[in-house]
């Protein structure tokens, strides 16, 4: 493998055996591609804004004299960039401008004569834009739109599995689900009649729909039944015979023809009888007259002579009717063929319960069901039915729906109209009846072929269409009002409804979520999340077990492991690593094609529906050099079942062993050795890890760390290759390689880094360069590490030396004993940044004022404020300190005589304002790292605001001029090259000032042209610089657009350093979580023979019952990795020659049976080997991919190479006594995470505080400054102890005895510790409730 200069700094040893056929795809593509589809111009008009416009426009006036046509649209440039939007608290969006054409037709002239055309560009609101990382900035906060897994449009056949009716009879139903429009359900009832429901309303007999479609009874029977024809000849009744229909029947008379008896009366008819009848070509048999009684007539029979109806279609025949028919000359009678086995009489029975008999009555019936209480008219009934399923505006199956619909009904074509046709409805009914008759199967709703993904773009498009439809109504009204000659398109379009619909979706939809920004992994997982909840989806309460379960079709599409615990389990899932959506929105996963028994590298993406037709081998099947399967029988999946197949039956093979799991689960090493429940917790807890002060790459990883870190967008990645020309903490400058430059550009890339910014979860986002001056970089190399990344690899926690042993009960019940060294080295110290805002409003009594002149506040409290009343940057503040001084005017109060006297003596005290300053919340302390002041336009800026403004201007100017210098230097070096090549001497040039270079003339025509081009570029550069500076200056100095009534906002940012302490929650990656019980002095920790103490002691009893053995293997492998690092460290300390180092490191990389990774250190220069060794000192990082990881033998070999015992256990000594523990202990390195459940955020104590309004009991929870609940179980405990007085105190004065508690407070203040319990308020509430039932209870005093 070829490594770039940056990648050679640290190479992770990979234990994977299976070749990597397909690289991990870009992990955010599901979000970015979907939104791109929404925004980009689509000439076909299939997707996005274009599709929405085309579906609503052209809008015609009611009279048809004018119409508004859509021409095209364009998105403008956003006003602020992403960072500015976050600081200012506005939405990152672009204005949408639409070109519309108003066409007015002549009234009197023939159809289509145009009188006037006006075209105009109209503003239609703002469209929020997606950032490069797949998020949206809405009102200054980053949000993610989660994709939704919903039921695909189409037709579904299902059954109630016998649960509806008490008899346990299975009732079948069919449901046509459109993309938008009314649902149409067909269902059987226990009596086998077929009913229809529209939009889940009252059910009607299904034949009503057919009658409404203008079918007569005769035509309906014709559609659904085969005929049995009887003929009357010579007073004998004969029946046309179709032998196949007799199968399984019992003959009720002798079946004979041509004098030969084929079946005797009472015998069952078998296949042999049928063969004989067919062989002899028997067409007619004689039947007894009684046989026809009870048969159902298939059409109307009319007496020709009188014109009266003898019997109507769907009537049962009797012998009387037969005689009448015979008399009136009907010798050929058609009846319906039904039997109990596979031709039920369902439609015929349904027609009997159908109250309607023609189209109009059917339409009226449907109208009454949809609009109860309204008087039906013919027009209303017709238009209602027409609009339900047959109007393009109200009903749309969508391309997906039509495809699924036609596939389900086994039709050839998969495209078609978006509305229903007569045939569609009849075919659905036919298939439902077939299923009831035992032919065909019902669908599986949880199959991923029946559920599809709706992503951002699609949902935004739907919302946008909703807004457009609202506008459409207004435009129609406007077009009908006349005065069209003066009307322009922009007078008709009101952008409010459109932007309101879009804003509502991005701001408050259930699927628009506040981004989880704990660490890069939680960001990436949030964007790849798939929810079954949300509008048009399921609800938590209604979802049963089946929907939440892992389905065979999830394989490679949805992760079976990563889902939340709790009420949402199984409803919120995560996309698998390689999964993507196809054009219809179904999830598909890649497979390698197998051709003639050879596994090729050709990749096919298969959806769940297609996958069912193939036999697919597992990724870990063994192959030989040519790509044949080694074993004769291969474990494969087919139709959702796993079993053995012979190797020539295999069609496809999995791409990778990690294709089953999601990104989160693919980061757990030795996942294959963990129980699934614990793996779920492990995957979920990695997302809660807080970024530590110094990121530390995991010694034992899975090889996915780099992909996650780079794709999450928290690192700075080189867009083009080049050389590092300048680097400091806040910017990196790359001089681009010649071959990657665009013609006519300076060839300089500048990367500005993010410094100490607050994330959504109050963690700290900070980027640090990881390249040095003069280093070569290639495209895609990581230039700067972000939070939780280390040299471009995800690093969520720290590698800790752990021992599995009990230690004095301090690791009882998953507690964790931690060494003080961990605190000293700041291993788990994290920085949290809090934003505190102070808003100055305009009140009725006058404006609030931000000032340092606050009434009744001592000097000490103001010591940290400047003269504007705003805290200094760098000030250390604690709970209760003032950050921003603010006073609010208050109304005049009545003064007491004493106050009046004091006023008169001491002059006017500022009595008309009250202190409403912003103070630091209790329990928070930290350093002020930034202050921002936003002032409304037209309000005078205070001194501090002007200072901040000046500083920002200075910084912007400095940044831009530095940028200009860098670009100029690049340009002049090229000018110099041209001049020297054109014959100007280098010494002469260096004496001239640079500006004069461009005035020199060259004899060579071509070189002179180049020089002129460069001179143009130089002018353009300077012009561009001026323009940028002016734009920046305008943005900084202009007033801010604040909410109505707000004059000023001051935001202060506090950085809080949190060290690890008892009560903090920690976890490994295998679901092994615990709480720190004690921080132990280093000298008391167990130590080994070299005197190295362990950092963390874990309870060995936490492993066996939880079955997450992965943590033990990780510990052993971590030990081996560290051992090799220690050996390299020793060699570096002894300053051994490079050859020895190279040889040892090469041995480590080559270790392991047939691993895929080949590292050839002979291609590395000595300097590169030394730098690699330097980076391996702390341990050699190892990758053990999921389901393809290191084997036990390989771990032992690695331990041996590091001169460590192969058992993985060593002798430990007690730090307090120095005695050896009685048996060897498992010691190694485990990657531990500090989770965002910090004791500082949870600790809370109440003395007195707020009470609930009705019950008068203290509130609960830290946010309300609430008390601790003393629940019924606690009451039982005190009762059991007989602690009556304690219990009385708990239930009265400490809770809701209002008078008692105020007296108690007074008593304690007076130093008298007696209580007088009274009546708890809850008892009064109970009395009131009983009285509300009409029972009067009164309390009597004794």
Swiss-Prot record:
It catalyses: RNA(n) + a ribonucleoside 5'-triphosphate = RNA(n+1) + diphosphate. InterPro entries: DNA-dir_RNA_pol_bsu_ext_1_sf, DNA-dir_RNA_pol_bsu_external_1, DNA-dir_RNA_pol_su2, DNA-dir_RNAP_su2_dom, DNA-dir_RNAP_su2_hyb_sf, RNA_pol_bsu_bac, RNA_pol_bsu_CS, RNA_pol_bsu_protrusion. Pfam families: RNA_pol_Rpb2_1, RNA_pol_Rpb2_2, RNA_pol_Rpb2_3, RNA_pol_Rpb2_45, RNA_pol_Rpb2_6, RNA_pol_Rpb2_7. Its EC number is 2.7.7.6. The modification N6-acetyllysine is found at residues 1022, 1200. Keywords: Acetylation, DNA-directed RNA polymerase, Nucleotidyltransferase, Transcription, Transferase. It comes from the Bacteria. One of its GO terms (biological process) is DNA-templated transcription. One of its GO terms (cellular component) is DNA-directed RNA polymerase complex. GO terms for molecular function: DNA binding; DNA-directed RNA polymerase activity; ribonucleoside binding. The RNAP catalytic core consists of 2 alpha, 1 beta, 1 beta' and 1 omega subunit. When a sigma factor is associated with the core the holoenzyme is formed, which can initiate transcription. Belongs to the RNA polymerase beta chain family. DNA-dependent RNA polymerase catalyzes the transcription of DNA into RNA using the four ribonucleoside triphosphates as substrates. HAMAP family: RNApol_bact_RpoB. This is DNA-directed RNA polymerase subunit beta. It comes from Shigella flexneri serotype 5b (strain 8401). The gene is rpoB.
